[in-house]
Amino acid sequence: MARIDPVRRAKIGRERRRLTRARLLDSAFRMFGRTHGRNTRIEDICAEAGVARGTFYTYYKGLEPLLQELSRQLTRDFNREVHVVLRKLPDAVERTSAAIRYFLHATVAYPRWGWALVNSSVGRYLYGAALERLALASIQEGIDTGEFSLPGAEVGRDIVLGAGFAASITLLRGPTPPDYAEQVARQLLIGLGVSRIRASRVATRRLQTLPAPAFMTLGVRGASASAQSQRR
């Protein structure tokens, strides 16, 4: 029997581990991406991925570490694309409005992505830690410039992210008016201290189109396809 080169064997082992990890993430994405996905258990993910429970614990110590990684995968690229646009906007009012509208529109366009975020977000921010920090900084800037009237940036951040969470669920359950995201953005800005006239104008401003977010249909990018072929 021919001996496999140790270097090649190690490479094959790394690739198998990568694909198994990707399969677990992809399975978690599909399970949490259901309407009632919040009740997903480790056993459900293992069954969906076609792996033993012991294999799961080789990669994750429990459900929480998996959810943290899933959240990063689901929000990383989209956060980056949104941030590129937000940096071009002139002030905190414009950025806050655009951010909430982008995410709410994406929730409607990609409901599995939306449900996965909602169902896996218990105990953490809906759109990830990076956006939480960005929201806090934008709110603080708005307070400093007098655009927002709030007792503190944390209050504004929680108003924004809380509204985003609740509105996402409403949109996912539907039906809602076509301009529901704009209605939420308008009332949100008013709640932050922006005048009604300006809030209405900003919340309905045309948004720049983002690149097609293909990753939203698959939380682990293209790795799942390779993992699927491994199982054939």
Task: Report each predicted region and the residues it spans.
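C-terminal peripheral helix-coil segments that are non-catalytic and often amphipathic
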Residues: M1-R8, A137-D144, R173-R232
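Basic, helix-initiating cap at the start of DNA-binding domains
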Residues: M1-T35, N39-E48, P65-Q68
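Short hydrophobic clusters on alpha-helical segments that form packing/core surfaces
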Residues: L24-F32, L74, F78, F103
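Short hydrophobic/aromatic patch on the recognition helix
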Residues: G50-Y60
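Alpha-helical DNA-contacting segments of helix-turn-helix folds
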Residues: Y60, L66-L74, L117
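Hydrophobic alpha-helical connector segments
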Residues: E69, R76, R80-R112, G123, ...
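Amphipathic alpha-helical packing segments from all-alpha helical-bundle domains
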Residues: N79, A98, N119-I169
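Amphipathic alpha-helical segments used for helix-helix packing
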Residues: A98-Y125, E132-A137, S200-L207
